[in-house]
Amino acid sequence: MDFPIRSQARLYPAQCVTFCLYVRVPPLSEWNFLKMQTDARPSATWPSVPKVHKRNRSTSLSDQQTAKKAHANHARLHLPQPIEPVYESQNGSVSQSEEKSSAVEINNSAAGDPQRFAVADLNFSWAEEEEKVVLAPYDYVASNSGKEFRTLILNAFNAWFRVPPESLTIICDVVRMLHTSSLLIDDIQDNSLLRRGRPVAHSIYGVAQTINTGNYVYFLAAKELNKLRNAASALEVFTAEMLNLHRGQGQELYWRDTLKCPTEDEYLKMVSNKTGGLFRMAVKLMQAESPAGPMAPVCDKLVQLLGLVYQIADDYKNLTAVEYTTSKGFCEDLTEGKFSFPVVHSIQSRPEDRRLYQILAQKTTEVEVKKYAVSYIESTGSLEYTKQVVRVLVQRARDELSRIDQGRERNQEMHALLGKMALE
């Protein structure tokens, strides 16, 4: 049977609205049944407020509001109050009231006693698990290693330097750490999407964490140098070449962001600082650790040539090689807006034509637009010109290699590496 209950609600100062609230009052038989159930099972819940299973200790705001309204309505209508819902947790069943008091206790416990700071040991140690968190972006890239070309070059140079194995291992590790950590930063600065065929680290770990990790590993590498026999000299070399690396990177970013095309010589100087810096650092560290000491061969010119060949050949492959499309994306240098060696030559060949400027400014990801850019670069003879430059530099490096080797052809590893770098 339904009974209307009249009430008045004041909605506006000058207006009252009368409304009817209809409540269904159960028949006497149902009341007796419910009373028997609640007497027999005091833990039973009111039918309209079901028991909740597998909940966390913290209840949501909506659950608390619903429970309060249910209690208020039953009290106003003189109905039996529903049993407070019970929530199951890992520590057993708890009610909402117990939940609140427990939460207060937890908060008070978390706050703790301020006096503990008077005697507490505040000398914290760095845990291995914490180190893993900070190094996660680096480990992600390092786990997908590349060609290890720099390690091959160091092994080839060691035919002359004869660096002790333990020192050579440290130098190779330092070079690998610096190269990998620089990739973390480069990918952010270039807005890259892929690195070695996988999503770039900052797309997974975030930009801020990836930058922090890249910088952190720079200092870890410097710390490793303290293990070398000539640690003081090694740190001087490290500092000088890291400065050169950042100078070269700064130049390249400036040209890209201001859409200023460098001259060929400006480009070569940038490459000498950016790419050649890491090669020079490695070779100078090996010279410092070599048992030959001052009698060790001077390889500065060869290292310089290797850095130029490596970068210019890389620029060429980025626009032409299929494997680069798989690992980095199709013509990624064009998407980055980069003034690579073929692009610089193409623009200078036709300075009045602004088409390449416009394409670089857009940082386009459209494949057809990039295909058109490559065909334009090819039409200016820039791809063939780049191949010829690499060929000349490789031959010059071979001549320098023969000079260092004094015609004895001892360093066959270096000859083999130069053969791989040539664009034949």
UniProtKB/Swiss-Prot annotation:
Instruction: Summarize where isopentenyl diphosphate binds, as residue positions.
Output: 147, 150, 179, 196
- Tell me the organism: Phomopsis amygdali
Q: What is this protein called?
A: Geranylgeranyl pyrophosphate synthase D
Q: Which gene encodes it?
A: GGS-D
Single GO biological process annotation from the record? farnesyl diphosphate biosynthetic process
What is the E.C. number? 2.5.1.1, 2.5.1.29, 2.5.1.10
Which amino acid positions bind dimethylallyl diphosphate, per UniProt?
Answer: 195, 274-275, 311, 328, 338
Q: Where does Mg(2+) 2 bind?
A: 186, 190
Per the entry, the cofactor note is: Binds 2 Mg(2+) ions per subunit.
- Any GO MF annotation of the entry: metal ion binding
GO-annotated cellular components: cytoplasm
